[in-house]
Amino acid sequence: MTISDWRIELIIVPVTDVDRAKTFYVDQLGWNADFDQRVSDTLRFVQVTPPGSACSIAFGEGLTDMVPGTMKGLQIVIPDANAALEHLRGNGIEAQGVDDQPWGRFVTYTDPDGNGWTLQQLVPQNR
């Protein structure tokens, strides 16, 4: 059997305050609020998706034992690092300036819990 067409669908991100995280990802970053459901007294599931992405993140209550702020290296591909930096800062998000490397242009920031994100503008590949 050949394995093909695998896609990452959902990544769980640990947070301390679900409402604060939802405000950050939806209102400040501008991501789509897909789902917010309290399943039980101990389980709340919130799913948000970056515009244009097929992969979402989820956070909530009772979803993971991971310590909030320990996710590092989460990466999103973007079309324009300068525009992304302007968007982040314009929405009150502290972000590092654009880091130009031969393999891409990068902007880094953290969510309110300290989970680390990197935005990457890909460089054209010579084929």
Where are these regions (language model features)?
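Short, solvent-exposed aromatic-acidic interface loops
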Residues: 63-64
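Residue-level "edge-of-site" marker
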Residues: 38-39, 101, 127
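Short beta->alpha transition motifs characteristic of CBS
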Residues: 11, 34-35, 119-126
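Vicinal oxygen chelate
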Residues: 15-19, 51-53, 67-69, 73-116, ...
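Core segments of cupin and vicinal oxygen chelate
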Residues: 3-6, 13-55, 90
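Positions in alpha-helical segments
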Residues: 6-9, 72
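Basic/polar N-terminal segments that are highly enriched at the extreme N-terminus
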Residues: 1-4, 126-127
